[in-house]
Every structure is written in structure tokens, then in C-alpha cells.
A protein has these predicted regions:
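Short, basic/hydrophobic alpha-helical segments
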Residues: 186-195
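Non-catalytic C-terminal interaction segments of nucleic acid-processing enzymes
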Residues: 2-3, 11-17, 21-33, 39-42, ...
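Active-site metal-binding core of divalent-cation-utilizing nuclease and nuclease-like domains
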Residues: 72, 112-115, 125-167, 175-177
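Active-site-adjacent loop/helix micro-motif of nuclease/hydrolase catalytic cores
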Residues: 175-186
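Structural motif
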Residues: 141-142, 171-173, 204-208
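Nuclease-adjacent, charged terminal/linker segments that flank catalytic cores
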Residues: 1-103, 107-108
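A short, highly charged nucleic-acid-interacting micro-segment common to nuclease
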Residues: 105-121
Length: 257
């Protein structure tokens, strides 16, 4: 039995080194990944499986032809298509996990404005899994299902194997207003101090300037006495990720047109 927060991680499905076992691990990890995130694209699958794009294209075509995946064309992301689950895939997952599953994502329910953002979140987690840094994760959709409420949700929550702690993942795709940033800081403080949902917040983006902007504005807000925010608390609990490799990866796969 695979823990629900580990579903989608390919290594959790590999029962032997046989060709069939490796194929099944790819298939079921992908189905669980899509179930948890709602949809995905070829660029995310490349990272998740750690294979070449040609392999991904060949495999997803087979899954589409087999009636497992629904391929949806879109101009809202660089890959120009995303993949959803078909009823057959849900039945396969229900049989695998021995439980009833509900999946209500349809092409009409996907917000085009958030597709790239959501794919980048998946990219960050897949990259962390590939690097051996993430043990398990909780998606934003799952936080919503767990009745944590809109004001407490982040893009994802992960278990950081290196630091042995829960961390929140936040992806910045644009500059935010000062009131919005102030609200976010208060939400982070509550989630960390009162609710014990995670210990740190990690800020990622496809461009260094958005990470820098978040750091600059947050520093200004936390240092202002009238906001009643502990500057040292946020310096300890918010980390701004300037990893050049990851920023370039995100930009080239999800943003560059």
C-alpha cells in the first residue's frame, strides 16, 4: 500500500527491475501524479520520470490511444497540451489502491490563467524528487480537500529530507501588491507558529527578479514596526531560492516562447 502523500513518486511503485515493472511504475506514478495535481504536461513528466522528451511523447501517445489519458490542446502553456485522466485511469487507480476515488477535472474546469503556474509547481516538486530532496508532498488541491481553508493554502507542502522538516512551496509568476504580500506574511506566520503546518516557506520563480522582488518587499514590510511582524522570524522561516539551474530549467520549459 502506497501512502497517499507518496503517490506519484515513481520509486514507490517499482517492485522489481524487470521491463514490465519499470513500465508499470511509470504508468501508475503518472496516473497518481495527475490525480493529485489535476493535470500535467510533457515537461513535468520528463522530470518526474527522468527520461528524454521522445520517450515521454511515445509513452503518453500510447496512454491516450489506450483510453487512459485525455489530451487537451491549449495555448496557455509552452507544451501546448496538458493531460487529464479518463474514467479508465480512475478505475485502474481504484483497483491499485483499493479505495474509491473522485476526480472531477475536465477541460472546461481548468483555468487557463493558472495552467503555467500550476505546472511550475509540479516542476519544482519533480525536480526535488529527482534530486533526492523531497520525501513526500501535499498538493494545494489536497490541502483544500483536507478543509484547511483558502487562507491557509500554499502551492504545495513537502517533507524536506535534507533538513528533516516540512516546508511550503510558493511559486511567483508575477509581482504582487504590497497588501497581498502583507496578507501572505501573516498567513505564513499563522501556519508556522499556530497551526504547525510547515517550518519554512521556499519562494521559487521562473525569473530571478520575481524572487528578488518578493525578498525586497517582504523585508520592507517585516522591518516596518507598524505591521507588527517579527523581522527575525521571517528571516529564519522564509527562504528565497536563487538556484540558477532550476530557474533556467523552469524558464526554458514553461515560460520561453
Amino acid at each position: 500500500m502506497i501512502n497517499k502523500h507518496e503517490r506519484g513518486i515513481p520509486s514507490k511503485y517499482l517492485k522489481s527491475t524487470s521491463t514490465k515493472a519499470r513500465h508499470d511504475a511509470k504508468l501508475y506514478s503518472l496516473l497518481d501524479w495527475i490525480y493529485r495535481f489535476g493535470f500535467t504536461s510533457t515537461s513535468v513528466i520528463e522530470l518526474l520520470w527522468d527520461v528524454e522528451r521522445s520517450v515521454v511523447n511515445r509513452m503518453v501517445k500510447r496512454y491516450v490511444d489506450d483510453g487512459v489519458l485525455n489530451e487537451v490542446a491549449t495555448f496557455a502553456c509552452r507544451d501546448r497540451r496538458v493531460f487529464l485522466l479518463k474514467p479508465k485511469a480512475i478505475r485502474m487507480l481504484e483497483e491499485l489502491h483499493g479505495e474509491e476515488l473522485r476526480y472531477s477535472i475536465k477541460p472546461s474546469t481548468i483555468n487557463p490563467k493558472s495552467i503555467t503556474h500550476d505546472l511550475i509547481v509540479g516542476c519544482v516538486i519533480a525536480f526535488g524528487l529527482q534530486q533526492g530532496k523531497i520525501g513526500f508532498f501535499i498538493t494545494e488541491r489536497e490541502q483544500q480537500k483536507d478543509n484547511q481553508g483558502k487562507r491557509r493554502r500554499v502551492d504545495a507542502i513537502c517533507y524536506d529530507l535534507h533538513d528533516n522538516e516540512m516546508v511550503a512551496v510558493e511559486v511567483e509568476c508575477s509581482a504582487k501588491t504590497i497588501p497581498h504580500r502583507l496578507d501572505l506574511l501573516r498567513r505564513y506566520r499563522k501556519a508556522i507558529s499556530d497551526d504547525n503546518l510547515y517550518h519554512k516557506v521556499l519562494i521559487y520563480s521562473h525569473k530571478r527578479r520575481y524572487v528578488k522582488d518578493a525578498e525586497r518587499v517582504n523585508s520592507k514590510l517585516t522591518s516596518k514596526e507598524a505591521n507588527q511582524l517579527d523581522e527575525m522570524f521571517f528571516k529564519e522561516h522564509i527562504k528565497y531560492i536563487y538556484n540558477k539551474e532550476l530557474i533556467a530549467l523552469i524558464y526554458n520549459k514553461f515560460w520561453l516562447h
